Each structure stands twice: as C-alpha cells, then as structure tokens.
Amino acid sequence: MKRKTSPILSWLLTIGFAFIAFIAVFPLLNLILASFRPSTELMRNGITLIFDPSTLTLDNFIYIFTEAGLYWTWFGNSVWISIVIVVLSLLFSSMVGYALAVYDFKGRNFFFLLVLIILMIPFEILMLPLFQLMIKLQLVNTYTAVILPAIVAPIAVFFFRQYALGLPKELMDAARIDGCTEYGIFFKIMLPLMGPSLAAMAILQGLNSWNNFLWPLVVLRSNDMFTLPIGLATLLTPYGNNYDILLAGSVMTIVPIVILFIFFQRYFIAGLTVGGVKG
C-alpha cells in the first residue's frame, strides 16, 4: 500500500526546492537584468537586483547589433569552431568507443584504462606539452590548434563505449552474413542506433567548445581570430571597462546554447539516461 506524504512535508519540500532553484537562477537573472542597464548606472549601484526600472534601456544590445562588428566576428569563430569540434568528436569518439566495446583485440583493456586515466587528469596539466607540440607543428594562432586536441574526447569515448556495450550483436552477425563490411556495419547499422547518445554528447561537446576559454587563449594570437569568451574578456582593460557591453554580449552568448538545449533536451535526457545504465 502506497504511503501518503504529509501535506506539511510536501510544502516544506516545495519551499526548499523553490529556494534552491532561486539560488541557481539568481546569477542568470541578475545578468539579464544588468545587461539592460547603462554603464553609469552599473558603476554607481553595481550589479544588483535593486535598481531604478526607469534606467532600463536597449542601447547595449543596439550597439552590439549595429556597431560591434568584431563581436560578430568572434561569434562566427565560436560557431564555426564548435560545429567542427562537435562533428569530428562525435565521429572519431564514437568509432573509438564502439571499437573498445565490440571488438576483442589485444590491448583493449589497456587502451580503455588509458582513456580513464586521461579522463581523470586535469587539462591544465596536459596544456604545456600540448602547446609545445603545437609550436613544433607550427599550428600556433590557427584554428587547427584549437580543434585538434578536442577531436577525441576521453569523456565521449567512455560514454560511447558504455552505450555500445548494449547494442545487439545479432545485428552485426546478420550484417556480416549478408556481406556487409565492418565500416558498413558501423555507419549504416550501429551509428543510427546510437542516436540518443550522439545527441547527448553533441550538446555536451558543443557546450564545452562554446565556453572554452583557456586553451584558445593560449594558442590564438590575432584579435580577429578570437573566440567569443576571449573576445569578451578583451573588453576588460586597465584603462576602462565596458561593463554594459560586456553584460549584453554575455547574454547574447547564452542564447544559442539555450535554444540548442530547448530543441534537443528530450534526446539529451534520453541519451544520458540510457547511456548511464548500459553495460
């Protein structure tokens, strides 16, 4: 028999969850409201929810859309880099994860252990040898230097490997009997079955590449090649800070990710749920 929950307990839980949700949403709400305030108001009262509503203006966003040409250059750079990283990462990481899950070859467990070890190492530790490698390859100040280290992500390999463990091997055997090659089995049969995991990892990889600040800052030199996070950081200088433009630009940076998640949240949740219980 199902036990009824006390009304008082339900109210307490609701209030508690509402308070936690408010704490989580508060910084974002503060950012959005501050982006509509002029620089003088921000300098006088700071970024706070207590302000004069009559000071709200669209001038910050109008400036970005009409005069901040370099902002859209940075925006385009981030979009292009994120798309390339997502496509290549999904392709190569899914192939590696699939191979580690399906094929029995010598050293398979060692390679999987290596993936787990790399997954636990902070990127800052690997950054110096990676940068030295980019110097030797003469890739500094190129988008290739930004994209190359993200092509095979350990977290994506682990995720796809766990998901591929639950794929029906009977389909592989049937395809081999019909004369299908191993590449054909992967691209025509298994990869479509990995759709939910691909959608989930596309959002995660896209979010990581979109917000990536440290590595592009290390390898990029030209101002017109900067990604959006680095470009926005250049608005903060010792000689003056354009907080109003910075806040409006930050809000515009969030919009593509929010739209992406709204349209793909069903696949994202399904991919994480199924991928988390495979194997």
UniProtKB/Swiss-Prot annotation:
Pfam families for this protein: BPD_transp_1
Residue ranges crossing the lipid bilayer per the database entry: 8-28, 79-99, 110-130, 140-160, 184-204, 245-265
Membrane topology annotation: Multi-pass membrane protein
Recorded superkingdom: Bacteria
Keywords: Cell membrane, Membrane, Sugar transport, Transmembrane, Transmembrane helix, Transport
A biological process from GO: transmembrane transport
Ranges of residues in domain ABC transmembrane type-1: 75-264
CDD domains linked: TM_PBP2
Location in or out of the cell: Cell membrane
Keyword Glycoprotein belongs to the record: no
Quaternary structure, from the entry: The complex is composed of two ATP-binding proteins (MsmX), two transmembrane proteins (AraP and AraQ) and a solute-binding protein (AraN).
Function: Part of the ABC transporter complex AraNPQ involved in the uptake of arabinooligosaccharides. Responsible for the translocation of the substrate across the membrane.
Family that this chain belongs to: Belongs to the binding-protein-dependent transport system permease family. MalFG subfamily.
Protein name as it appears in the record: Arabinooligosaccharides transport system permease protein AraQ
